[in-house]
Amino acid sequence: MAKVESFELDHTKVKAPYVRLITVETGNKGDKISNFDLRLVQPNENAIPTAGLHTIEHLLAGLLRDRMDGIIDCSPFGCRTGFHLIAWGEPTTTEVAKALKGALEEIANVTKWEDVPGTDIYSCGNYRDHSLFSAKEWAKKILDDGISDQPFERNVI
């Protein structure tokens, strides 16, 4: 079986919340795609409940695109500690951390239920499993902890 980078990462050494560059892949025509680890909570110490994580996912889909060009996808980790962010080009971890911070600030302080996209049977495959209350509480906690642009040392942006 192929080795997967995220399973090679020593999850006991990282210091969440952080943004980590996993890899930059170069396509046949020279296009670059960057893969980031947006770790919101400390692995094996906490996990965001699915309803809150699901709502954060739906909100980050738009809010990160409002703050950064070239976003391809932002998908949650199965362990519920964060997200993969895939983007064209080579944005820095600092740029991504600033965009993430701004998005979480909007979730925590501004977002209302009617702002959450994809919350009905037509636009979401599990539309009943959302919680804006949980999303706001987790966003506040992550912001209070501070988002670092480095995974192994705290360099809060």
Swiss-Prot record:
Binds 1 Fe cation per subunit. One of its GO terms (biological process) is quorum sensing. It comes from the Bacteria. One of its GO terms (molecular function) is iron ion binding. Its EC number is 4.4.1.21. Fe cation binds at residues 54, 58, 124. InterPro entries: LuxS_sf, Metalloenz_LuxS/M16, S-ribosylhomocysteinase. Keywords: Autoinducer synthesis, Iron, Lyase, Metal-binding, Quorum sensing. Its cofactor is Fe cation. Belongs to the LuxS family. Involved in the synthesis of autoinducer 2 (AI-2) which is secreted by bacteria and is used to communicate both the cell density and the metabolic potential of the environment. The regulation of gene expression in response to changes in cell density is called quorum sensing. Catalyzes the transformation of S-ribosylhomocysteine (RHC) to homocysteine (HC) and 4,5-dihydroxy-2,3-pentadione (DPD). Homodimer. This is S-ribosylhomocysteine lyase.
